[in-house]
Amino acid sequence: MIYLDEFTGMEVSIVDSPNRSEIGRTGLVSFETKNTLEIDTGRKRIMIPKHLRKFRINGQFVDGDLINMRPEDRLREYRRILRDLRR
């Protein structure tokens, strides 16, 4: 399940965002914090908040609000993530 993985090194694309200029941006995740993903686009690195965004990571769609936590905390929050996915 991709929601439990650490995203560093994975290919990411922004599918939906309140900021329309972010939609369609693609690259590799170079760093991940609790609230942001740092994406290396090839030309520069951009910081994208996870909140209110939808991503496609390695071909799978991911809701940014469900991954809005530290990577190591996602394993502890496994049951909450599964419950929210069922909604």
UniProtKB/Swiss-Prot annotation:
Q: Where are the transmembrane segments?
A: none
EC numbers on record:
3.1.26.5
InterPro entries, per the entry: RNase_P/MRP_Rpp29_sf (IPR036980), RNP1 (IPR023538), Rof/RNase_P-like (IPR023534), Rpp29/RNP1 (IPR002730)
Record flagged with keyword tRNA processing:
yes
Q: Give a yes or no for keyword Nuclease in this entry.
A: yes
How would you classify this enzyme at the top EC level? hydrolase
Gene Ontology MF, one = RNA binding
List locations, semicolon-separated: Cytoplasm
In terms of one coarse class, where is the protein primarily found?
Answer: cytoplasm
Q: Which SUPFAM superfamilies match?
A: Rof/RNase P subunit-like
The record's keywords, sorted A to Z, are:
Cytoplasm, Endonuclease, Hydrolase, Nuclease, tRNA processing
Lineage, top-rank taxon, reads: Archaea
The record's section on Pfam families has: RNase_P-MRP_p29
Reaction it catalyzes: Endonucleolytic cleavage of RNA, removing 5'-extranucleotides from tRNA precursor
Q: Name one GO biological process term.
A: tRNA 5'-leader removal
A single GO CC term for this protein reads: cytoplasm
Family (UniProt)? Belongs to the eukaryotic/archaeal RNase P protein component 1 family.
Q: How does it assemble?
A: Consists of a catalytic RNA component and at least 4-5 protein subunits.
Q: What does this protein do?
A: Part of ribonuclease P, a protein complex that generates mature tRNA molecules by cleaving their 5'-ends.
Name of this chain's protein: Ribonuclease P protein component 1
Q: Which organism is it from?
A: Thermoplasma acidophilum (strain ATCC 25905 / DSM 1728 / JCM 9062 / NBRC 15155 / AMRC-C165)
